[in-house]
């Protein structure tokens, strides 16, 4: 299976992963890109930032702008709505994964 096809299948899980980490602590794009690489996902900033913006637009993340060593950095934290969606997504993902590996 091609890398593009596989990446397309995992985009939903990447969004859940973003919400999961944003629930633990504020995240920002560059650092989160490293987190995804740890799990074997090579995702460009041209893909990652639109995902972050869409999650913010949908009310699942909130952006906080901070000045870090003279640089403006945009951090994202989960919202109440985002946390509710995360809990539901985790439950559904677990159900699917359990089914995939039940044999």
Predicted feature residues:
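Amphipathic alpha-helical dimerization/coiled-coil segments
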Residues: 87-103
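Beta-hairpin "wing" of winged helix-turn-helix
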Residues: 58-72, 77
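A cross-family signal for key residues in well-ordered alpha-helices
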Residues: 17-20, 53, 87
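Basic amphipathic alpha-helical segments that dock to polyanions
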Residues: 48-50, 54-55
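Short, intrinsically disordered or compositionally biased N-terminal tails of bacterial proteins
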Residues: 1-5
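N-terminal helix-turn-helix DNA-binding core of bacterial DNA-binding proteins
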Residues: 6-47
């Amino acid at each position: 299976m091609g890398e593009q096809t596989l990446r397309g299948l995992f985009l939903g899980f990447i969004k859940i992963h973003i919400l999961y980490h944003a629930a633990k602590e504020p995240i920002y794009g560059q650092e989160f890109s490293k987190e995804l690489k740890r799990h074997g996902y090579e995702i460009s900033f041209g893909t990652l930032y639109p995902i972050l913006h869409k999650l913010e637009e949908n009310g699942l993340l909130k952006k906080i702008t901070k000045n870090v060593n003279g640089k403006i950095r945009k951090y994202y934290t989960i919202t109440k709505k985002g946390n509710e969606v995360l809990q539901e997504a985790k439950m559904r993902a677990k159900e699917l994964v359990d089914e995939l590996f039940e044999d």
